[in-house]
Design a protein with these regions (language model features):
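Long, charge-dense tracts
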Residues: 2-139
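Long, compositionally biased intrinsically disordered regions
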Residues: 1-42, 46-51, 292-368
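Accessory beta->alpha helical hairpin/"wing" motif in late/C-terminal subdomains of nucleic-acid enzymes
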Residues: 276-296, 300
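Acyl-donor binding region in acyl/amide transferases
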Residues: 12-13, 22, 26-39, 58-59, ...
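Short secondary-structure boundary segments
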Residues: 73-93, 166-188, 223
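A conserved beta-strand-loop-helix scaffold within acyl/acetyltransferase catalytic domains
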Residues: 116-218, 227-237
Length: 368
């Protein structure tokens, strides 16, 4: 507990009302209170999670309260604990590497024209199995992804990219989907073993992609796999324009991205910034590399380069793409309309505006 006061302030919510006389009068440290409240065979972390889940509140409120506690949880080894070693889904015979690794840089716009070899829509049971595998793959690396945390077991597909390279596309449960973009998480599998993940948002034939290879599997066929990811995204959403946001490039405090030279990885695959200052800095660095082949961009330079989105247009360059569309204007327009017409009565306003939108779009609200 880095800030025990946060847990102490909500302790009464985790206990029963009949326990409050002791909580009010006795000043035990919060850790001692948790030890007294939990069961003899129950861990402190399990107690807090279970009691938070039992609160008489909506899921978003419970989630917000729990996140505000800022707890660090330790996974104890055991038969039911997620494991990197045993993370695997059996989906056919293994394909062994019989030739050199594909370490070159593919022509991404040519790659997107080669669709996956096949796609399989999973049953709810198999979909949940893949979601559980994705969650375990993340938590054992101290990572998290909403698309996996709120994955919909009825919206899971496996894309066959050849040589037992597969992408498990996981959609989100309806109540967690974004208002405008279609968001999917992809678990990257090689011979059934998770080797990375992708987060993709799609709208208007454009896609914003966050591509990650787990550290164990880096330095191999990253560019080749990236091309297969783009081809899958095109097959799913018809995307012809792709963007990478600053965090993936090493911006917004992503020191790991800076150290790995992520910005140049995408630059060499054809992505370009639109910001003139960023383009000038890129050209300056390229000139220095030409003069001195051993030159490497400094961390401060990479941090400057990573301040802006980069884009790749496989057809015509256009502005109606993710990264350039002002989504915030949509939210502000909705807020203004709700405030002007309904004020605090947001529930009534939501229903009224939904009916008006459905009427304009010719949608039968009764059928959703």
């Amino acid at each position: 507990l880095e800030e025990p006061g946060k847990l102490e302030r909500v302790l009464h919510l985790l206990a029963l009302y009949s326990e409050t006389p002791a909580l009010d009068e006795l000043s035990y440290p919060v850790r001692e209170w948790i030890d007294r409240l939990k069961g003899p065979r129950e861990t402190d972390g399990a107690f807090i999670v279970r009691r938070t889940r039992a609160l008489e509140a909506g899921p978003r409120l419970r989630e917000s309260l729990y996140e505000d506690l800022d707890l660090w949880l330790r996974l104890a080894p055991g038969p039911g604990t997620p494991s990197r070693t045993h993370a695997h889904v059996p989906r056919g015979p293994a394909v062994f590497q019989a030739g050199p690794l594909r370490t070159g840089r593919p022509d991404l716009c040519a790659e997107v024209q080669r669709p996956p070899l096949g796609v399989e829509t999973l049953s709810r049971r198999e979909g949940q199995r893949i979601i559980d595998l994705a969650r375990g793959s993340m938590v054992t690396r101290s990572r998290d992804l909403d698309a996996f945390a709120y994955g919909d077991p009825e919206d899971v597909r496996i894309f066959d990219c050849g040589d037992r390279l597969e992408l498990a596309a996981i959609g989100m449960i309806p109540e967690r989907r974004l208002l405008l973009e279609a968001v999917y998480g992809f678990l990257t599998l090689k011979n059934g073993v998770p080797i990375g993940y992708v987060l993709n948002s799609a709208l208007f034939g454009s896609a914003e992609m966050a591509y990650n290879v787990f550290e164990t599997f880096r330095g191999a066929e990253a560019a080749h796999i990236y091309g297969r990811v783009m081809a899958t995204v095109r097959a799913l959403f018809g995307a012809d324009s792709f963007t990478i946001y600053p965090y993936q490039l090493g911006g917004d405090g992503n020191d790991e991205g800076l150290q790995s030279g992520a910005w140049w990885f995408y630059q060499k695959l054809g992505f370009r910034a639109r910001n003139p200052q960023t383009l000038r800095l890129m050209r300056s660095e390229l000139r220095r590399m030409k003069t001195n082949p051993g030159h490497r961009s400094s961390i401060p330079t990479l941090r400057q380069l990573a301040e802006e989105n980069v884009y790749l247009h496989c057809e015509r360059e256009r502005d109606d793409v993710i990264g350039l569309l002002p989504f915030e204007n949509v939210g502000m327009a909705i807020t203004s309309s709700l405030a002007r017409r309904f004020g605090s009565d947001r529930s009534r306003g939501e229903g009224a505006l939904a009916r008006e939108a459905a009427e304009r779009l010719g949608v039968d609200v009764g059928r959703g």
